[in-house]
């Protein structure tokens, strides 16, 4: 089956030196693009989830530094902008990785800075396509694949990680379908994954976050495929809150649990998941829905945006460098020297 070419959510307007972001807060109701010209504006867009997904925010930050350089910013301004962008969201390691890579170009001609940003974008999309090719054979024939949050084209430079595996499987002729967890409270699954897959002609059904265990028990799910925001050296995986619960359920029901992520998500400097900083977001994002408070006034809420899935619950990690199974630490260490 031929799948529609996926959207690219982060673009650079070379003629006007602007970063163009698909506003993911507006989806699925409206396909709206924002045009930004400063690092501050891009950092704010990263923080408020206008652009989200670990690889995508790395690309956005790279282009933010490129636009500053192209508009004449000097080294001091670029270093300050890099620091601001790197702190926009703490859990996703791709952001800091992209900023470090761009920072190495401070002092170079602006054209070189932009070329580096383009390279980060192009390499990410190529990595996603390779992840898809390596992950597709892992998906059982005609399976119903459960995914969480959005790890598709919208979360990357294009094509996607977890949804890249889905896309590649469909392109190879595997007639699979997808269950998309709604993913409270930002509803990345219901709003973004469902929109993206429906747009591309891939069958998708939205679930509430509490349904997965029952459907697993009924034999309606063949495997779980998720993305990642950071993978520790031992194979522990930080991903959207709710991922850990799915991994526990998958293990109980003896279902494969796959993590798909580019190598830039692997952080060998972080020993275990316990060392990964977990972003805490505002409680209003939990108790306010469509402008209406859904919990009694005065009742507090928690919103850790991510959780950590222990490596022992991960069947395999799929990166563009290869597929890693237990023992994950040894496999990741071996891939660190692979090219």
UniProtKB/Swiss-Prot annotation:
List the residue(s) that the UniProt entry marks as the site Transition state stabilizer.
149
Q: Which residues bind substrate?
A: 52-54, 89, 188, 239-240
- Which pathway or pathways does this protein act in? Amino-acid biosynthesis; L-methionine biosynthesis via salvage pathway; L-methionine from S-methyl-5-thio-alpha-D-ribose 1-phosphate: step 1/6
InterPro entries per the record? IF-2B-related, IF-M1Pi, IF_2B-like_C, Initiation_fac_2B_a/b/d, M1Pi_N, NagB/RpiA_transferase-like
The protein's superkingdom reads Bacteria
What GO biological process term is on the record, naming one? L-methionine salvage from methylthioadenosine
List the catalytic residues.
Answer: 229
Reaction catalysed?
Answer: 5-(methylsulfanyl)-alpha-D-ribose 1-phosphate = 5-(methylsulfanyl)-D-ribulose 1-phosphate
Leading EC class: isomerase
Enzyme Commission number, as recorded: 5.3.1.23
Task: Report a single Gene Ontology molecular function.
Answer: S-methyl-5-thioribose-1-phosphate isomerase activity
Q: Which NCBIfam families match?
A: eIF-2B_rel, PRK05720.1, salvage_mtnA
What does the protein in this record do? Answer: Catalyzes the interconversion of methylthioribose-1-phosphate (MTR-1-P) into methylthioribulose-1-phosphate (MTRu-1-P).
Q: What is this protein called?
A: Methylthioribose-1-phosphate isomerase
Recite the lineage of the species: Bacteria, Pseudomonadati, Myxococcota, Myxococcia, Myxococcales
């Amino acid at each position: 089956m031929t799948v529609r070419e996926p959207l690219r959510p982060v673009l650079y307007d070379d003629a006007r030196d602007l970063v163009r972001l698909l506003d993911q807060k507006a989806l699925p109701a409206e396909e709206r693009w924002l045009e930004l010209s400063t690092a501050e504006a891009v950092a704010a867009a990263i923080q408020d989830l206008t652009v989200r997904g670990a690889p995508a925010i790395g690309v956005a930050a790279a282009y933010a530094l490129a636009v500053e350089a192209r508009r004449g910013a000097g080294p001091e301004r670029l270093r300050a902008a890099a620091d601001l962008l790197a702190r926009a969201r703490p859990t996703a390691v791709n952001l800091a990785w992209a900023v470090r890579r761009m920072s190495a170009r401070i002092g170079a001609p602006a054209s070189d800075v932009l070329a580096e940003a383009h390279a980060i974008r192009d390499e990410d999309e190529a990595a996603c396509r390779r992840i898809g090719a390596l992950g597709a054979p892992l998906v059982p024939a005609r399976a119903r694949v459960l995914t969480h949050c959005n790890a598709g084209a919208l979360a990357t430079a294009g094509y996607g990680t977890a949804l890249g595996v889905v896309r590649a499987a469909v392109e190879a002729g595997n007639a699979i379908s997808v269950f998309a967890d709604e993913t409270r409270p930002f509803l990345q699954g219901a709003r973004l994954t469902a929109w993206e897959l429906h747009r591309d002609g891939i069958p998708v059904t939205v679930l509430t976050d509490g349904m997965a265990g029952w459907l697993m028990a009924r034999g309606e799910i063949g495997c779980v495929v998720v993305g990642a925001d950071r993978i520790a050296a031992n194979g522990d995986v930080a991903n959207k809150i709710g991922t850990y619960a799915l991994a526990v359920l998958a293990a109980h029901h003896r279902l494969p649990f796959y993590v798909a992520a580019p190598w830039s998500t692997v952080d060998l400097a972080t020993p275990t998941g316990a060392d990964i900083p977990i972003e805490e977001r505002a409680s209003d994002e939990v108790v306010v829905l469509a402008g209406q408070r859904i919990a009694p006034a005065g009742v507090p809420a928690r919103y850790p945006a991510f959780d950590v899935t222990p490596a022992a619950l991960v069947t395999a990690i799929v990166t563009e460098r290869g597929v890693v199974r237990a023992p994950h630490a040894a496999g990741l260490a071996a891939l660190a020297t692979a090219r």
